[in-house]
Amino acid sequence: TRFIVTRECDAHPNVKQAVLGAHDACTVSIKKWIMFGRDLKNAFTQKYQEMQAAGASDEELLQFLNKHTMYQALVQGDTEQGELPCGQDAGMINDLLSAAEVIENIVAEIVPVFEELKSKLSVP
């Protein structure tokens, strides 16, 4: 999810704005056949969950999914009717960075953790 909101990512600007405007309870886990996915809450996820709760058949759910695609959200920018996959961390993303800056931030955060672990694992 973090890399969707980078300058280099080709995701539609509406998607980036949707993630930037997200809060800590903005995602929902949805079951699609035998696996779960996590999406940004929107009209699509609400309707999909309502259909599941009402006992919609796999065929009905598939037809719905075919009309509400990731392409619709990520490329066309329809962040309400398209499926917008993202992780639980979406609400923690609050800036548009370059991919290089994201990597630099990850490294800067992990180096002290590695150093602390290394000091605890040292053999006398």
Give, region by region, the residue ranges found by the protein language model.
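Conserved active-site-proximal phosphate/metal-binding subdomains
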Residues: 2-124
